[in-house]
Amino acid sequence: MSESKAETPSKSAEKGVASLSTSAPPSSTTPTAQAKQTPPPVATTARPMASRLPRTIAAEGGGTEKKQSHLAEDRIAQYLPKQDAVDHSNLAALLQPFTEASYEREFDVKVNGIASKAELTAVAETWASRLNVPKENSAVLAQEIAIHCYHNGSSEQTDFNLKSSQVAGLNLEAAVGVIKEILTLRQFAAYYATFVWNWGIKNEIPPANWVAKGYTDETKYAAFDTFSYVGSPLGLRITPTRKPTNNEYMAASVNAREKIIQSRGKGMVTNSPMFSDGTTHQGIPLHPKLPLS
């Protein structure tokens, strides 16, 4: 009986250890021991930076190019049917191989600087309906306006208060007013650039103000503001009497830049360029500042 109730030394030791771990106060230790027993800091639960970014950036790793690609796909997706209803036959039609006939087609291309065929048609029809201009006279009226721009420029301030020499009883200002309702006067004049170029050379009549613009005798036929459209396939389809020279291109380019500088009010203009040798003078101030006394 006494042997069954007695506890073995090992079990007594285990109970002693358990009581120390639960009820006994912590024993005093040195500062070094306390430092060693300090538990490690708990990891913070702050969200990483990527999770705080917008979904489109975080999902793509924050890359600018990937974000732009993602946004572009979203814009395109609105024009496409739902994924389960995509019809790839339209895509196949776009990817068909091009044939020789593809290169023979004519396309009505719209360029901002020059009149389109649709705009010119609208001008001619309005001339006929509003100003009673016979359709057979539309071409010669357009040429008359283009020649006027050749000599006086094609800005919105160009004066057209004169009678037409080609259409009896018509004031050119009314005809130009119709043009300005549909397109700019410069776009209209640009369409006839090759025509006025040929007309000037064949009749030996350069633009009236070529000297005032600083052109030389060698470059005088380029002294009109739509010169850059001479020979353009988008203009009136006639062959230029001759191809403009490099000096003529240079003269027109410098003169155009000078006009831009003046119109922007920078206070600086170039001197008349010496186009014969391809050089220009240094710019001089329009209103030089005088030293204060």
From Swiss-Prot:
Its main location: virion. GO terms for molecular function: structural molecule activity. Residues 18-37 have a biased composition (Low complexity). InterPro entries: Pltvir_coat (IPR000052). Keywords: Capsid protein, Helical capsid protein, Host-virus interaction, Ribonucleoprotein, Virion. Belongs to the potexvirus capsid protein family. This is Capsid protein.
